[in-house]
From Swiss-Prot:
Family per similarity comment: Belongs to the YciB family.
Function text: Plays a role in cell envelope biogenesis, maintenance of cell envelope integrity and membrane homeostasis.
Name recorded for this polypeptide: Inner membrane-spanning protein YciB
Signal peptide positions on this chain: none
Record membrane topology: Multi-pass membrane protein
Subcellular location field: Cell inner membrane
Source organism per UniProt: Pasteurella multocida (strain Pm70)
Keyword Cell inner membrane: yes
TM region positions: 19-39, 52-72, 76-96, 123-143, 151-171
UniProt xrefs under InterPro entries: YciB
Keywords for this protein: Cell inner membrane, Cell membrane, Membrane, Transmembrane, Transmembrane helix
Top-level division of the source organism's lineage: Bacteria
Any GO CC annotation of this UniProt entry: plasma membrane
Keyword check for Membrane: yes
Amino acid sequence: MKQLLEFIPLILFFAVYKLVGIREAAITLIIATLIQLLILKIKYGKVEKQQLFMGIAVVFFGTLTAYFNQLEYLKWKVTIVYAIFALVLLVSQYGFNKNLIKLMLGKEDALELPEQVWNRLNLGWALFFLLCMLINLYISQYLSDDLWVDFKTFGILGMTLIATIITGIYIYRYLPQTKSNNKE
């Protein structure tokens, strides 16, 4: 349910943008995001830092988008957020010797992987966020607003799904293999 809850504001934004327009879509996105954060707080007792950061970014850039009736502000939000995600992953690993992917996945799922695997995963996700940033920058500047909204809603979602599947396949190779002994 938690993952589904994260997509509801985006889906509502897409629908309202296609049916009504940018100002109403931005306002819908802001309200849906605030409700989402409230539900997360009530249901899970806390809001993760990443979700809070995204919520603040949505409110800030969404407000600018609604006020000026210009989609450019939300386009920049996506570019800036992905740049920050990539930067945080890289600086935490190479500047502070902390692997955030390991902290997120290793604790929650009790994954025990070799350190080099965690480092590659961290670097891989940083590169993924940089790729998303660059593709978003290109589409937002050179293609139509309608195409950008489609890309933001479905393209990045698809790219993230593919990156997650690749991560799972990569991790699976390093999981301890259990041997089943069915001899009686």
